[in-house]
Amino acid sequence: MSGERAKRFPLALEDLKRAPRKSEGRPGERQTAGAVPKAADKPAAVLKPVAVKPAAVRAPLPGIAAAKPATAPKPTALKPALPKPAAPSIAPAGAFALTSERVRERMVERLRANGVTDARVLDAMAAVPRHLFVDPGLATQAYEDSALPIGHQQTISKPSVVARMIELAMAGRTLERVLEIGTGCGYQAAVLSHVARDVYSIERIKPLYERAKLNLRPLRVPNIRLHYGDGRVGLPSAAPFDAIVIAAAGLDVPQALLEQLAIGGRLVAPVGAQSGQHQVLTLVERVAHAQWRESRLDRVFFVPLKSGVI
């Protein structure tokens, strides 16, 4: 033992030179040391299938990913398919019923039967889509001869009343400049724009003023000028007017409006108590600088004419 130990530790130069040969010829301890690298090689061989397994796992992933796009269109294809049947049964049918010229023609036929004879007034009533000026929930009633609420305790006048007032204001004339008091939703201003060169309209309720602008915008009416202000004051900067149409009832006609009426001009307004029980459609004609002639015509019902703005 001691001799062998002395031989190995430290090794002589010639032993070092012979060391490789001893590792091949002696299977003792050095063979065990040589087995370690072989064991290290074995995990490498074991790792290769492990490396293949992720590849085998990845291989189906593209197949699954490819299957998802194939199934994804199915729900998207079903979603549009559901509204498509509903759309033709509701929207187009309703839009056609409301916008068809035939519906407005029937309204015009009723106006003619009720005594409106001016062809220009009838054409103007037929040209303006009244359903665009009322709430969507009331659109189906737009061409009935009834007043409809537009909010803020205001209403859109009956088609028969609108046609009657405009016909009285025109009296067969061609109107150059017209003033409307009470824009409301903008419907009467739109009708007036077809029979007058320039239409000025005043609204004292700011939300209605804004709503009228929105309602008139799609129609692209170039000759209407909307103003937010007190209608009882009128619009002196644009006076005189060939005609003034007041869409609210006061106990009398404001003097400021009478002064803004051109000589030979005509003013049409409901006059009477705010309760509406004794309101009468009144025609005022200016016959001279300081002279007006008044005619009391039809029983009507309008919202009250108020001063100021809100």
From Swiss-Prot:
Keyword 4Fe-4S listed: no
Record EC number: 2.1.1.77
Pfam families cross-referenced by the UniProt entry: PCMT
Main location: cytoplasm
GO cellular component, one term: cytoplasm
Active site annotation, chain numbering: 157
Assigned keywords, A-Z: Cytoplasm, Methyltransferase, S-adenosyl-L-methionine, Transferase
Highest rank taxon of the organism: Bacteria
Enzymatic reactions: [protein]-L-isoaspartate + S-adenosyl-L-methionine = [protein]-L-isoaspartate alpha-methyl ester + S-adenosyl-L-homocysteine
A biological process from GO: methylation
The family this protein is said to belong to: Belongs to the methyltransferase superfamily. L-isoaspartyl/D-aspartyl protein methyltransferase family.
Known role: Catalyzes the methyl esterification of L-isoaspartyl residues in peptides and proteins that result from spontaneous decomposition of normal L-aspartyl and L-asparaginyl residues. It plays a role in the repair and/or degradation of damaged proteins.
Protein's UniProt name: Protein-L-isoaspartate O-methyltransferase
Species in which this protein is naturally found: Burkholderia cenocepacia (strain HI2424)
Taxonomic lineage of the native organism: Bacteria, Pseudomonadati, Pseudomonadota, Betaproteobacteria, Burkholderiales
